């Protein structure tokens, strides 16, 4: 539920007024969908407000550490504040800086890595520089994001991305990693998928395909969407 400058979930609140990209469906879907089985350490690349990291903290065991990396100073400060205000402050860690620099310096591997990366090709700049950086694929391509994530992944670990459908297809074709899960996200029943949730591993496995429709033909939330997100949304 929206509340002033933020968004209130069942077990935590997100302030995002100083973040370029606000709480949105893409991040919520990824935070609810990512498989955390056998996870002892989790990394959120480009954490923004800290939304996905907090969702994964809620879903994971008490001994699991969650690290978020954010390059925008204002967003990083707000994510840190959101972490500290949550029930899981003792196992949430914020790292300020570029994800490529973090990968070179952190000296740690992670069991699960999540990313909701920028997805618009560089074109006409947004008026707000921070929002421009958050939305556009400028400094790093999606393939580079995935390559960085792979360098930080344990041998049996999993990387989870949310992307526009066409860009997800391109990413699958460009990587040597194996896509082990794919969920095509349909905004409304009868329409084509606009988003895709993808999971990658170093180990070869068959891809498990699924679909998720958010709204039915009468603009009501579908049962599958409610079941996926009911531990977070107040309205469910």
Curated annotation (Swiss-Prot):
Record-linked Pfam families: MTS (PF05175)
Chief location bin: cytoplasm
GO CC entries: cytoplasm
Subcellular locations according to the entry: Cytoplasm
Recorded catalytic activity of this chain's protein: adenosine(37) in tRNA1(Val) + S-adenosyl-L-methionine = N(6)-methyladenosine(37) in tRNA1(Val) + S-adenosyl-L-homocysteine + H(+)
Assigned keywords, A-Z: Cytoplasm, Methyltransferase, S-adenosyl-L-methionine, Transferase, tRNA processing
Domain of life from the UniProt record: Bacteria
Entry-linked SUPFAM superfamilies: S-adenosyl-L-methionine-dependent methyltransferases
Biological process according to GO: methylation; tRNA processing
EC number from the UniProt entry: 2.1.1.223
Gene3D superfamilies: Vaccinia Virus protein VP39 (3.40.50.150)
Molecular function (Gene Ontology), one example: tRNA (adenine-N6)-methyltransferase activity
Family: Belongs to the methyltransferase superfamily. tRNA (adenine-N(6)-)-methyltransferase family.
Function, as annotated: Specifically methylates the adenine in position 37 of tRNA(1)(Val) (anticodon cmo5UAC).
Protein name: tRNA1(Val) (adenine(37)-N6)-methyltransferase
Taxonomic source organism: Actinobacillus succinogenes (strain ATCC 55618 / DSM 22257 / CCUG 43843 / 130Z)
